[in-house]
Amino acid sequence: LLVQLERMCNPQMISKVHNSKNEKIKEFEKLVENYFKQYKMPSFYADKLHVTANYLNKICKTETDKTAGDIIRKRITIEAQRLLHYTNLSVNEIAHDLGFDNVSYFITFFKKQVQTTPEQFRKLANQ
């Protein structure tokens, strides 16, 4: 029992576990970058990483203080803001480009994330 406790408290072992979590987070962030337009659910990314959605959320929360869903939504929001600010694409085109089948759902999503509509954001960003 003492040997097991010593192994569990071994700083090298703790470091390996921490590094493993960091690697999973890095892999997750790469996957989000590649797939955020098509896949918005953490379960897709968890499957790709060969972990459960609950475990993915746990390591995200531990390492970044955000859930996996928060990280995905943040990436979608950043891309929406970039497209609104730097392109002349319509809100409908941006919604479609970001994988939203319904423009009104995109507007609701955007407003919840940014506290303003896409059109209002564009006007403010381009002043």
Go through the PLM ranges and name each one.
Residues T62-I107, K123-Q127:
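Terminal helix-turn-helix DNA-binding modules in bacterial transcription factors
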Residues P42, A53, V91:
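Helix-turn-helix DNA-binding elements, focusing on the entry/boundary residues of the two helices
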Residues L1-V3:
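Core structural elements
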Residues K48, D97-L98, Q113:
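Residues within the alpha-helical elements of helix-turn-helix
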Residues L5-K30, N34-K48, T62-D70, K74:
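Short, Lys/Arg-enriched, Trp-marked, Pro/Gly-tolerant hinge/linker segments that flank
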Residues R7, P11, N34, Q38, ...:
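Conserved amphipathic alpha-helical interaction elements at protein-protein interfaces in regulatory
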Residues L56, Y105-F106, F110:
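Short hydrophobic/aromatic patch on the recognition helix
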Residues S43-F44, E93, Q120:
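Alpha-helical residues within helix-turn-helix
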